[in-house]
Every structure is written in structure tokens, then in C-alpha cells.
């Protein structure tokens, strides 16, 4: 049965967030949809554009969780632990309160764990992935993603592509991985650029934008690398659009952006693999001696 009482929908969204507003057509979903031929292990939505708030416990008997299927879908979870899969289309999936597992699937998605210790993965496409409160495990998958831990001690893994990472509050682990096709070329300059410089540097690797040593942030090295296997250098960069590299977080997805392109002159530490010279990542506004590193096993980051 479907209901459209928005007051009841809002009451069920126990920790409604200010980041992502509900669409006006959202409905409360209290029972499976009549999708003939669906796999009983999954809770399938329709192949159209759906907008649902999940009632508590609605996914309890479907071990494979929710599949949004085709369409540009909006799903807000309940207060329980839920498994959601966006599949194809531009989807917005919000976990709600509970330790949720959320995967975007194909295309551009906006994913938000909200409250609870969540696993959130963009999978394919250029995604926005937010952890929310508690200690979250966040990964980008393929594509150029924006990852935001928010509060709690989070683990952020960009995976493939050139990603932007914000840990926000808490002691966060930013995991850098070696990638096929990584560049070993030089970037930026040793001195600040002259006033009026508009020669923009291409960001070649994952960019950590709010590393905070005072909060206990560390950088995790994957692939068997240790601190002895990397070299650090400090460079001055000219990058843009500046709104995509603010230390406070990404420009809101769907936000109205004025047309002018904005330049940011900043300083960053460049992290390279010593043996190949390949750039593993960059860290904004932090000097090399402020960075702390740990080695992370492939098993520790295999979740996905």
C-alpha cells in the first residue's frame, strides 16, 4: 500500500538531513510493488522514475536488498539497517538511521549514509558520496567522485578515477592506491604563481582537501606500500573551478552555479611512489611534515 501523507513521511525520516531535500512527489512505501517475475531475493522498484520513503522493516525478508532498476530514482531509508542498489539511472539514495549498505550502480548518483555506521559506494559514474554521522566506509568506485566523510572516524577510498576527498570532523583515513595509467609528470611550480596567472594545472590524482592532523587524520597506503616507498614534495598549484576544491566541502550537487570560472591558487603536498614516480595523491594546504601514513592491507579495503 502506498500513502502520500507527507507529514507521516517526514515523521518516518528520523534524521532528515539538510543536504538533500525530498522531492514533492515522494510516497511512503509500506509493501512490495507488484513487479511480476521479480527475483524474490530482491525488493525491486519500477523501471521508471521512483520517489519513495521506506517504511521500517520493509526490506527485512529480501536478502539482496532494494534494486532501483532503471529511471532516476529517489529513495530515503528508514530507521533500520538497509541494503540499497541504485542500478542504472541518476539516483539519490539516503540510508536513514541504521547501519546501511548503499551502492550507486551505473551513472551519476548522490548517495548519503546519514546516521549510523554505513558502507557507501558510488560504483560506476561520477558520484557524490556522503557518509553522515558515525564511522563510515566510503568509496568512489569508477569515475571521478566527490567523497565526504562528515562526522565520525571515516575511511575514504577514491578507487579508480580522479577523486576529491573530504573527511570533515573526526580522525579519518584517506586511502591512496596505485593506478594503471597514473602520471609521473611534474605538476605546479616551486614558487607561487604570478598575480593574474590563469594557466590552470590539471589535477592528476586523488585530491585530499581537508586533511587535519589535529583531528588524527592519516593517509593509508595500499598495494603493499609503506612510508619508505613514497616521496613527498610541496608545490604551488593553480586549479579550477575553485568551487570544486573548497576545504569546507564540495559544491552542492544540483546547486545553481554562476557561469564564471573561478581560479584558486593553493599549495599542496604531492605524494609519489618512489620506484615509478607516479603520483598517488595530493593534499591541499598541508606541508609534508604534517602528514602521517599507515599501510593498509588489501583485505582491509576489499569491502565493496
Predicted regions located by residue number:
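A generic structural signal for beta-strand entry/edge sites
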Residues: 51, 216, 266-270
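GD-rich hexapeptide-repeat beta-solenoids
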Residues: 1-59, 63, 70, 173-190, ...
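Acidic, glycine-rich calcium-binding repeat modules characteristic of RTX/beta-roll
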Residues: 56-67, 72-76, 81-235
Amino acid at each position: 500500500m502506498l500513502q502520500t501523507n507527507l507529514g507521516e513521511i517526514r515523521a518516518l525520516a528520523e534524521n532528515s538531513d539538510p543536504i538533500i531535500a525530498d522531492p514533492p512527489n515522494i510516497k511512503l512505501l509500506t509493501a512490495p510493488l507488484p513487479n511480476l517475475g521479480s527475483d524474490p531475493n530482491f525488493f525491486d522498484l519500477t523501471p521508471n522514475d521512483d520517489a519513495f520513503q521506506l517504511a521500517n522493516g520493509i526490506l527485512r525478508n529480501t536478502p539482496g536488498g532494494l534494486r532501483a532498476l532503471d529511471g532516476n530514482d529517489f529513495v530515503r531509508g528508514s530507521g533500520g539497517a538497509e541494503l540499497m542498489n541504485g542500478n542504472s539511472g541518476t539516483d539519490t539514495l539516503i540510508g536513514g538511521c541504521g547501519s546501511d549498505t548503499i551502492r550507486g550502480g551505473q551513472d551519476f548518483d548522490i548517495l548519503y549514509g546519514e546516521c549510523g555506521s554505513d558502507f557507501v559506494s558510488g560504483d560506476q559514474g561520477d558520484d557524490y558520496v556522503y557518509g553522515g554521522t558515525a564511522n563510515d566506509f566510503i568509496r568512489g568506485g569508477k569515475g571521478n567522485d566527490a567523497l565526504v566523510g562528515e562526522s565520525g572516524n571515516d575511511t575514504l577510498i577514491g578507487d579508480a578515477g580522479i577523486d576529491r576527498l573530504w573527511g570533515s570532523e573526526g580522525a579519518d583515513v584517506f586511502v591512496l592506491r596505485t593506478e594503471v595509467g597514473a602520471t609521473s609528470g611534474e605538476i605546479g611550480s616551486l614558487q607561487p604563481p604570478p598575480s593574474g596567472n590563469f594557466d590552470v594545472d590539471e589535477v592528476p590524482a586523488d585530491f585530499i582537501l581537508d586533511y587535519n592532523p589535529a583531528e588524527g587524520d592519516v593517509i593509508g597506503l595500499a598495494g603493499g606500500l609503506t612510508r619508505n616507498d613514497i616521496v613527498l614534495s610541496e608545490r604551488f598549484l593553480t586549479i579550477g573551478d575553485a568551487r570544486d576544491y573548497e576545504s569546507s566541502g564540495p559544491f552542492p550537487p544540483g546547486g545553481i552555479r554562476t557561469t564564471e570560472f573561478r581560479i584558486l591558487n593553493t599549495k599542496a603536498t604531492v605524494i609519489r611512489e618512489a620506484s615509478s614516480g607516479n603520483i598517488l595523491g595530493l593534499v591541499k594546504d598541508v606541508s609534508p611534515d604534517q602528514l602521517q601514513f599507515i599501510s593498509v592491507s588489501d583485505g582491509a579495503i576489499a569491502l565493496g
